[in-house]
Each structure stands twice: as C-alpha cells, then as structure tokens.
C-alpha cells in the first residue's frame, strides 16, 4: 500500500536549476525570476518565452505544486512585436523593475545573514565519505520499497536464538532447542559436537516430547520454559500476560522429564498470576513472586513457604517496580541465587512515598469487563511513577537463608543513605560473597559494596566520583562478570571484570581480589568496549568482548588475556562489519552473528582456543538477498563531520536513482539520547529506507554530542543541559548539507521518536526556521520535569539542584517554533513511559502564544510504541503523507491562503492602466 500523493517516476526529482534557499521557496518563484522575465521582455527577446515554458514543465515535478505560479510566468511573455508604450510607461516600468530587484537583493542578504548568525557556536569540517551501495541492491532498475513491506517485517533478517546450556557435569557446547522440527521432540538439549559430519551418535536429551500437556482436565501450552540445571525437571509458564515493557504474569507448572507429566508450581493456587520464578543452582528449589510477595518451594516437597508477607501496592519483593524495570535492570527480575544455592538475594522496593500517575484507557477492553454502570467511563491504571525531583522508591538488598528459612539484611558502614541510593547491579561470587553496585540518586558517585552473606557483614570496597572525573555519570549495567579463584591457572583469588572509564573511554578492568580497588586494565585506546565482557574462558584465561575498535559505527569480536596482553580479533577487521556473539558456558563454542552492512548471516563456531574445530552455517538469509536484488535500496554514505572539535558520525541515504544534477529535499532522522547510537553499519531496511527509496528524498542521520561510542568527553558534554549541544549538531550538519549542490536547502525536515521527538522540537526551537522548515515529533518529552527520575537526573541532576538547566531544556520558546513553516506532534494517550502530559502541556503553550503552524494527532490507548488498534501502521502512514505534503509546499500555502496579486502582477496591471490611460 502506497502513499496517495507520491509520484514514483525518476524524472520527477527536483532539478539542479533550483537554487533558492529561502524557507518559502515554493511560493516564491521569486522576485528575481519575475524581474528577469520583465527585463527579457523589455529587450524584445523570445528567450523569456522558452524559459517560461521550460520552467512550467519543471514545476510539475513530484515535490512541487506550482501550477498557479507557472501561469503567472506565462503572463509575462511579451507580444511578438515587442512593447509599444509611451515613454512615461517605460520610465515607470524601469522604476518598478529596479525596486523589485532591490527588494529581492535585500531579502537575499537578510536571509544570508540569518544563516550565518547561528553558525558562530561551531566550527564545521567534513570527513571523507565511505559509500556502501549494497552488493545486493536492485539499484536504479529495482522496485521501490513499499511501506507495508517495511512495517510488516518483510525486511527483517531471519535469525536463530541459541540458548547455550551448562551441562550438569561441566560439559560445554550444549544447546537448548525448542520446537522447529516436527520430527524432533518439542524441547531438547543437543550437544553441538553431534552435528559434525560423520558423527552418528545421538546425544540428544529429550525434555518435553510434546508442545502441550494435561494437568487434570486443563491443557497447558508453554509460553516460556526453563529446564532445571540437572535437566530432570522443566519450569513452564503458560497464559503469559504482558505487564510493562519487560514484565509479565502467568501460570507456572513443574514438568517431570522422566514421567512427562506436569503439576502446578503452587498446588494450592492453579491460577497463580505469578510474576517471576527461578531455579536454584542445585535444581532442588524454586523461588517465585506473586502479588509482590516472595515464596519458595523446595523439591520434591509440594509445600510452598511464604518468604515475605507485607508485599502489596507499595512494597515489592524480588521484582522491580516500573522505574527500576525501565531504567535500571531492563528486566522483570530482581532476584539473584548464589552459586551454591544457599542464599537468595532480592530487591526490596518501598514505593509508599512515590506519587501516582493515572494512565487512562478510553477504548473498552473486552477482556476486562466493567462493573455495571461504569462501562462508559475510562479505565484508569495508577502507576507509581517518580518524576524528576519527586520522591524515589527506597530500595535495599535483602537475603533469604534457604536452610534457616530466615530473611535478613546487612548494614554496611559508609553506605549511601536510603533516600539517595540506587541499586544498579548484583553479582554473586563464591562462599556466600556478593558484590552490590550502587550509585547516588544523580548517578555520579559509584559505590561498590562487598557483602558476606554467611557472616552477615559487608563493606564498601570501591567508590568513585564521576562528577569530579569528567562531569559525567554512571550507566546501570548487569555485565559484571565473576572470575573464580584457580591457583593452578594463576588466579589465587576471586575477582571480577567490569567496564570502567579509562583515559576518557570505556574499557575492561579486572579486579582481584574482590576487595581490590586498583584493577588490571585489560583494554585501552581511543575506542570503547560494548556491553562487555561477553564471556570468560576460565581454562585458558581469555576474555571475550565486543568493541567499536575499528570505527564507532562497527562492532568486532576480540579476546584479551586476564593480564591485559595479547588482544586479538576473532573476526575479520579489515572490512566493515557489525558482529555480535553469544558464547557457550565454557566459552568453547559461540553463535556468531554478522549483522551488516551486507546481508546478515549466522554461524555456530568453535572459538579459536578450542582444539575441537567446528563451524556450521545456520542462516544465510537467501530470501532477503534475493528480495534486495529486486528493490531499489538506497545507497549509504558514511562520513564524519567535526563540530566544535567533536568528530561525529553521519550516514546519508540517497535514492538508488540519485542524480547529482538535481535538487533533493532532505529529511533528518535522529534519536540522540545519552549513550545511544543510531548511525551503525547494521543491515537495516526501515522507514528511513522507505523515504529514500519510495519518496525519493535524501535522509541524513548524525549522532551528535551525548551519543555513544565516541568517548566520554563528547558524551558528558550534554550533562545538565539536554538538547542544547545536540540541537547545534543537527543544525550545523543540516547547514553543511544545505551547501551541497544536490540539496534543496529550502526543503529540509527533521523527525524523531521519544528522545528523538524531544530533539526534533528542541532543534526547531533553537533553529527558529533558519535551517529546518519542517519537523515531526512522535511521543516527545517536552519538559524533563515530567519524565522519570532515574533516567532524567542521571543526565540533568535534580530540578532542585539544576533549575536553570531544566528551564533551558524544556520546549518553551513557541515564538521560535512559529518561525518554522510547520511541524507535527503525535502521541499515544496510554503512554506509560513518556506521558501525554508532555504533549498537552506544550499544546497549551502554543495556544497561549497564538501559534497555529502545527498539526497534532492522538492515538487512543496506545502506549509508547503506538501499536494499539492498527496505530503503528497509521502513524507511519501519517508521517509519510505529512512529509510529502510538506515537501510539495502544501503547508506553505496554508500560511497565506488568501488569494492576492503578486508584486509583479500588480506592476503589470499598473503598466496596462498607464498604457490604456
């Protein structure tokens, strides 16, 4: 399904002749062209007639709707015999023409001056372009992308998720396989070595033969499964119901592998609505949370013991509340078993002081019947949502002693106070020791606490002030990796690996013993590791990690020894690549994913240190490659732009039929949030690809200051002042593009979603119509006081400590927004993340400022992803249609809809009056 107003012919692109730069380029064929036509006529030349006819044909292009203007130009073609007018007419005529030219020149230099003013904050230079046309692209002769194909996942590469399973006796290379092959059992564990050619042994362990089972008269169909570590039992969840982004509830069952029968996890509650459940490392117990309280069932007993009793609306045990799920753990679990199965650590969250935000749902929910007489009222869900500056949930780590059946906590000297503590990571070591990573509320002071659960004692072993270091912050992370002692292999003490700032970049560090605050730095250089480490080969003392070492837009896989020596790539680093990896429990095998820039593929391989060599291709995406050959995918031009000393990554998407002699409108797309990255070399066919391929526009993305993998200096520059420098980077990049011969600087737009929506509005506000004429903001933050505390205060401090920064970052200068030709805002009314309060508050400011140059659309009951009731398709269709209208000049016409005579036509009318007078 296409966009109604688009025109797909290649020749319908803007022509190079069009060089006007003004915001109103479409409705100003311009005084200059009118004056030149008049002068040509005065000289009796027929050239003006040919120019007018040529101009008219050009104005019938895709991005123009200038038929009326074409008619005006035709009106200036003189009679074949030339003019025969009294001398006074010629004098007046000359004066009028002179005034026209003078007016045009004044306007030109005023506009030129406007463009220079906002450049004073940045020195701009551009790097060389690295072009990736796409080997498989159908090029100029290919079909244009259609929006439905992009939205419905036709261009999503096929991928296989492999769940590596640690063998009961330390065996490496075991895979958990679920479904997929009707000739095999539904749930099974396979040894990767059995797949080698010539190996006839069947080492498969069957866990579940069928994809469903009966419990009494009830049919159970698994939504998720978790085998026990000894592979004798399977924990099964059915009837999964979504809660927030990562969390869900469901009914839980225990399935016996030997008898192939199941029973309820809690025999006393068949419809448990359980929020979380997890196995003991010894396979002899399951701990779970229901209605915010924790329980444990120790097998083979059928009895369930309640661990906590006061959980409820304000108290959570073992699971995160909304803000911790969203901003800290990115997961539904806040429960951690120790490696020996003797203790369970869990998060206790007290939300009693956290204010509520009511999310209203207006569309009747057939799965949730209303009470009589209330069916015509909105359903309201109240969320404990701490906005910036509001009271936070109070959290602390508690422990459950499995043998003693006791809950306890540990007081730590010099620990952060309750109301100024965020728990951002928990990692068990050996012998009941656990490492807890904490920060203060503003996330710029790190405190690492080592607790001995057996002795019920703890101490702060490491602390760091990131505000003093570089003015930055600590990002929450759950990648800390425990490295157990092994004296025979040169490790006399327990230790751990995590990412730390080192010389301005994020690098790997090995801390040993556990209470050592001075690590061995494993990596260094002007590049950064990514979510590292991926795994540690304990036998060989090798650390596997992913890094943006070759280029910030790329990812390659490396190893380094625990002493920091012998850093080696395990994939080709000579060509551009974006890789990810999932390693087996012993790091002897890996699922290697190549994600771009070419067609993605996947392999299961043995790692270089493994003497048993293995390689199996499990996905080459031939269907995707074949489809790409048939379509006109845009070419990607990667380059850098240096603004105020910061080298930033840019990608430009050009239509496959790109002609450098034509003039193209440009759409900027951004996200831009702190630590994020949008410019990568992953294979991706998305809305931006559709805009370039189908609509024929150029699409540019620049990762500005604040984004990830370009060093802490660039990332931390935005702290306390979100939006300011990021907007400068968008504006300066747009100005640089506007100077290119193939770009129509009079038709430039910007769009983004979420943080990108905020940045769209902030850029339009800061630009005040000088560079960008149009913008589209989806689910935008408009005032950081309205967003959640943990995310916002990490980058902005609290409103109490930085009131001026919050004032500056809010979208408030509606006079500046009014300088754009037009912008659009869309939002889901059921957004639990970026509340519609953001958009409504901005609309009120726009109304108070009598600003009218915007459109707004609300999607009923949609959350932040905007999916409810066909909304996702509709929001992208709306973006596409609106953009076509913008670049066709529809919004320019609405600015001055009253019919009027142009200056030139009035001049011609005056001449006719004088001639006839």
Curated annotation (Swiss-Prot):
Protein's GO biological process: proteolysis
Residues covered by region (Disordered): 1-78
Database matches in Pfam families: DPPIV_N (PF00930), Peptidase_S9 (PF00326)
Segments on the Vacuolar face: 112-917
Glycosylation sites: 350, 465, 813
Basic and acidic residues composition bias: residue spans: 16-26, 55-65
Chemical reaction(s) catalysed: Release of an N-terminal dipeptide, Xaa-Yaa-|-Zaa-, from a polypeptide, preferentially when Yaa is Pro, provided Zaa is neither Pro nor hydroxyproline
EC numbers, comma separated: 3.4.14.5
Top EC category: hydrolase
A GO-annotated cellular component: vacuolar membrane
Membrane-topology descriptor: Single-pass type II membrane protein
Chief place of localization: membrane
Residue ranges, compositional bias (Low complexity): 27-49
Localization, UniProt: Vacuole membrane
Superkingdom: Eukaryota
Cytoplasmic side: 1-90
Transmembrane region(s): 91-111
Keyword set includes Protein transport: no
UniProt record similarity statement: Belongs to the peptidase S9B family.
Protein name, UniProt field: Probable dipeptidyl-aminopeptidase B
Organism: Coccidioides posadasii (strain C735) (Valley fever fungus)
Designated gene of the protein: DAPB
